[in-house]
Amino acid sequence: MERTLTILKPDCVRKQLIGAVIDQIERAGFRVVAMKKIRLTQETAGEFYAVHRERPFYGELVEFMSSGPCVPIILEKENAVADFRTLIGATDPAQADAGTVRKLYADSKGENIVHGSDSEENAAIEAGFFFSAEEVVRSN
C-alpha cells in the first residue's frame, strides 16, 4: 500500500472546507492514517518548502503557509501519489480538470487549497516532517 502526504492549506481551513475536502479524498478510496491541525511558523514553513528557496514564489508561499492553521494528512491507497495528484488537479485552478479539489475550491495558483507530494520518495520525507512513527495508524 502506497502513502502520500497532503496538507490542507490555510485557505482551506479559513473557508471551512476541511470536511468537504476530506470527504472527497475518502470517496476517492484514500484512507487517512495520520492527521493533525497545526500552525506553521515562517521558519517551519520555510524548512518544509526549502526545495523552492530559489524560486520567485518562495517568500509568498512561506508567508501564506504560515498565515493560519493547516492540516497535514498521511493518506494510504494503491498508487496513492499519482492518484492523489489526479484528484487534486493542476496547481493553477484555472487549468484544473472539472471535479478536482482545486477546480472546486481554489481561488488562485498561490492559494490552491491543498498540497500533494510529487513522488513516493518525497511523500516519505514530507510525512516524516510532520509525523512521528507513533502518530501513524497502521491500516488493516
Curated annotation (Swiss-Prot):
<protein>
    <recommendedName>
        <fullName>Nucleoside diphosphate kinase</fullName>
        <ecNumber>2.7.4.6</ecNumber>
    </recommendedName>
</protein>
<dbReference type="Pfam" id="PF00334">
    <property type="entry name" value="NDK"/>
</dbReference>
<keyword id="KW-0546">Nucleotide metabolism</keyword>
<feature type="binding site">
    <location>
        <position position="9"/>
    </location>
    <ligand>
        <name>ATP</name>
    </ligand>
</feature>
<keyword id="KW-0479">Metal-binding</keyword>
<dbReference type="GO" id="GO:0046872">
    <property type="term" value="F:metal ion binding"/>
</dbReference>
<dbReference type="InterPro" id="IPR034907">
    <property type="entry name" value="NDK-like_dom"/>
</dbReference>
<keyword id="KW-0597">Phosphoprotein</keyword>
<dbReference type="InterPro" id="IPR001564">
    <property type="entry name" value="Nucleoside_diP_kinase"/>
</dbReference>
<keyword id="KW-0547">Nucleotide-binding</keyword>
<comment type="subunit">
    <text>Homotetramer.</text>
</comment>
<keyword id="KW-0460">Magnesium</keyword>
<dbReference type="GO" id="GO:0005524">
    <property type="term" value="F:ATP binding"/>
</dbReference>
<comment type="function">
    <text>Major role in the synthesis of nucleoside triphosphates other than ATP. The ATP gamma phosphate is transferred to the NDP beta phosphate via a ping-pong mechanism, using a phosphorylated active-site intermediate.</text>
</comment>
<dbReference type="InterPro" id="IPR036850">
    <property type="entry name" value="NDK-like_dom_sf"/>
</dbReference>
<dbReference type="InterPro" id="IPR023005">
    <property type="entry name" value="Nucleoside_diP_kinase_AS"/>
</dbReference>
<feature type="binding site">
    <location>
        <position position="91"/>
    </location>
    <ligand>
        <name>ATP</name>
    </ligand>
</feature>
<feature type="binding site">
    <location>
        <position position="85"/>
    </location>
    <ligand>
        <name>ATP</name>
    </ligand>
</feature>
<feature type="binding site">
    <location>
        <position position="102"/>
    </location>
    <ligand>
        <name>ATP</name>
    </ligand>
</feature>
<keyword id="KW-0808">Transferase</keyword>
<keyword id="KW-0418">Kinase</keyword>
<dbReference type="GO" id="GO:0006183">
    <property type="term" value="P:GTP biosynthetic process"/>
</dbReference>
<dbReference type="GO" id="GO:0005737">
    <property type="term" value="C:cytoplasm"/>
</dbReference>
<feature type="active site" description="Pros-phosphohistidine intermediate">
    <location>
        <position position="115"/>
    </location>
</feature>
<comment type="similarity">
    <text>Belongs to the NDK family.</text>
</comment>
<feature type="binding site">
    <location>
        <position position="112"/>
    </location>
    <ligand>
        <name>ATP</name>
    </ligand>
</feature>
<dbReference type="GO" id="GO:0004550">
    <property type="term" value="F:nucleoside diphosphate kinase activity"/>
</dbReference>
<dbReference type="GO" id="GO:0006228">
    <property type="term" value="P:UTP biosynthetic process"/>
</dbReference>
<keyword id="KW-0963">Cytoplasm</keyword>
<feature type="binding site">
    <location>
        <position position="57"/>
    </location>
    <ligand>
        <name>ATP</name>
    </ligand>
</feature>
<keyword id="KW-0067">ATP-binding</keyword>
<dbReference type="GO" id="GO:0006241">
    <property type="term" value="P:CTP biosynthetic process"/>
</dbReference>
